């Protein structure tokens, strides 16, 4: 009986530690088709479900064409935070870009992903005179 109780408590404890306190509404966003040289932005939202304030240590993009912005102040329990990701649509073609978000006190980062396709921007039609 003691062994069963011990293993039940152990499993419950492991489950609590495995969960991230940041609960994102989404971790992947599809921009669809974007016009070349027109930056595109998406805001990823999350809620702090943990017992302590949540601090973002870093949000790092995989390349220079993607820029993440994140709050520097702690997100208190139950409050919402956002990470704004801007993609500079300079190169034509399909793209997949990642932003790695590291929270203080968490070993595993959260990976945010944006995808889409950059198409040629059509020139404005000439006005008839």
Question: Each predicted region: which residue ranges?
Answer:
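Surface-exposed loops/turns
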Residues: 36, 77, 91-92
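A short beta-strand micro-motif common to beta-rich folds, especially ectodomain repeats
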Residues: 95-105
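Surface-exposed binding patches on compact interaction domains or structured appendages
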Residues: 51-80
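Sec-dependent N-terminal signal peptides
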Residues: 4-16
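Asparagine-centered strand-capping/turn motif at beta-strand->loop junctions
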Residues: 46-50
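Extracellular/luminal low-complexity segments enriched in Ser/Thr/Pro
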Residues: 82-91
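Long, low-complexity ectodomains and other extracytoplasmic segments of secretory-pathway proteins
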Residues: 18-39, 43-45, 106-129
